[in-house]
Amino acid sequence: MIFEGSISVKAVMLANKRPIEKIVIDKKKHDKDTAFIIAKAHELGIHVEKADREKIDALCSGTSHGGVILYGGDRRNDALDQLIKSKFLCLLEGIEDPFNFGYCLRSLLAAGCEGVIVGTRNWLDSASTVTKSSGGASEYLPIYVADDLANAIL
C-alpha cells in the first residue's frame, strides 16, 4: 500500500510497525523534511527512489502527497496484554469512515491516550487514509484489533 505525504512517511518510518519496501521522492524536493526522510531511510536501509512529480502523481489517488510516498506492508497488531497495562486506554466502536477514525486517533493521542482497542474491520485497505487523516498518530498509537470486543475488555 502507498502512504502519501511527509508526515505519513515519517510516521511510518519512526513508528517501525510495518515493513517498508521503498520511498519515492520528487527529484525537485530539497527541503528539511525531505533531507530528514532520506537520512532516516539510509539509516534504516530503505531504498529511496527519485522520480518526476508526474510519475508520483500517477501512482497516487490525488496530488496531496507533496512529492513523497512510501510503499509499506501491513501493520503489526499490538499485544493486548501490553495495552491493558496502560493508564489511559480507549475502546473505539462504530466508526466506519477512515477519515473519522484517523481524526479520533489523532485526538486520543493528543489527549494522552496510551492505547486503543478496536473491533475487526478491514482498516488495512484504508491505512493510508487513516495515517494521513490522523497526522501520523495511527502509526504511533498502540492499537489492538479484537475479534470480540467484549472478551477483549474483560
Predicted regions mapped to residue ranges:
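N-terminal positively charged helical leader segments and presequences
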Residues: M1-D81
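RNA substrate-binding interface of SAM-dependent RNA methyltransferases
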Residues: D81-L154
